[in-house]
Design a protein with these regions (language model features):
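Positively charged, amphipathic N-terminal segments that serve as targeting/anchoring signals
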Residues: 1-57, 71
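Conserved RecA-like P-loop NTPase helicase motor core
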Residues: 50-139, 145-147
């Protein structure tokens, strides 16, 4: 993954600094209002003062504990596990990496205050993940507009 290739690289420090800047200078939120995720093995490399305690594993489900968080950083670019993908493919099941990725991201974002209809700040540094979210919003909006006709 990107993290493995760059773990001793300036890019990890850049991601940490950008995340720190997002929470401190852009959203200006308190630590208790922040929620963020990355791969668990890289959490300590990215964690920063003022948001470290807001870490939540990206695959956490069925919790309302973070519903008061208004600033979210999704520091992942998700793909199917290659072994799982190969298993499904070999058994005739089509796997859609993009559908999987947007589903995972939406599940994570849903842990925040957005579940109560509140506005939240989103930081998604991966252009792929950001574009998937924008496409999903646009497609969902089009469907709702069609229903109103």
């Amino acid at each position: 993954t990107w993290y493995v290739r760059n773990q001793n690289n300036q890019l990890i420090k850049q991601l940490k600094n950008a995340t720190n800047n997002y929470f401190k200078n852009y959203t200006k939120t308190k630590s208790s209002e922040n929620l963020w995720t990355t791969f668990k093995n890289y959490k300590t490399m990215i964690a920063g003062k003022g948001y470290a305690k807001g870490f939540l594993s990206s695959n956490t489900r069925a919790t309302n504990e973070y519903r008061d968080r208004i600033a979210v950083a999704y520091l992942l670019n998700k793909y199917f596990n290659p072994c799982v993908k190969n298993f499904f493919t070999q058994n005739g099941v089509k796997v859609d990496d993009d559908a999987f990725a947007i589903s995972e991201m939406l599940q994570f974002i849903w842990r925040s205050a957005i579940r109560d209809g509140e506005q939240v700040w989103l930081y998604i540094p991966s252009s792929r993940m950001r574009n998937l979210l924008i496409q999903w919003i646009n497609n969902t909006s089009k469907i709702k507009m069609e229903e109103l006709k």
